[in-house]
């Protein structure tokens, strides 16, 4: 038979997750993925990687937190929530996401209160839709264009998870600022943190928040990570 996973006595979180310490309101704290999620397809007795450049649509997928892989973009909040659930996790609440991003010292960029160029993946020079389609007017950016799988395959766009090793904080979470936007569990549809083109327009660093889209929206720039309640070591 298959051996069941055994948790460490030193951490209440699953592999690939960081433990965020408790507060007076939540003494146990919570767990959050160290890395932006990648996906594996798990329907029809399969367990195979899902392309990070394709929307999962009707496929059954589960979220994975792993270093050194292309994180999943092109994903809606509903799809992200289902992928977290399939992994025994859940999407992070806004407050959980923001606390983990800011780190234990509660700083705007996690690593500090001042932006340090190059620490995070946030300075891609050319908008990928313009680069790929030569479409400089946003009126020409339709749903099909914004979900083209080639966008995140262009050089200098999305980075491998954890590749920007200093885009982190003492909690040991990576890429919460930049790389891909990240969905939270807000039922109205919220994603946070900015992406490889911008971590400024809708707020600086961990304060970056977009609320313009509903939970079924997806495009190349949006990914996610999962949270979970800690499990007692006893």
Where are these regions (language model features)?
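A short glycine-rich, aromatic-capped structural motif
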Residues: 4-81, 85, 100, 178
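Processing junctions and N-termini across compartments
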Residues: 6-7, 14, 86, 114, ...
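Disulfide-stabilized extracellular ectodomain repeats and their linkers
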Residues: 10, 28-29, 106, 158, ...
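Structured loops at beta-to-helix junctions and adjacent beta-edge loops in soluble globular domains
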Residues: 22-23, 33-35, 40, 112-114, ...
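Short, solvent-exposed loop/turn elements at domain surfaces
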Residues: 28, 39-45, 118, 192, ...
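Functional-site microenvironments in short loops/helix caps that host divalent-cation chemistry
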Residues: 77-210
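Short proline/glycine-enriched turn/loop segments at secondary-structure junctions
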Residues: 211-218
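Short, structured beta-strand segments at or near domain termini in extracellular proteins/domains
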Residues: 220-234
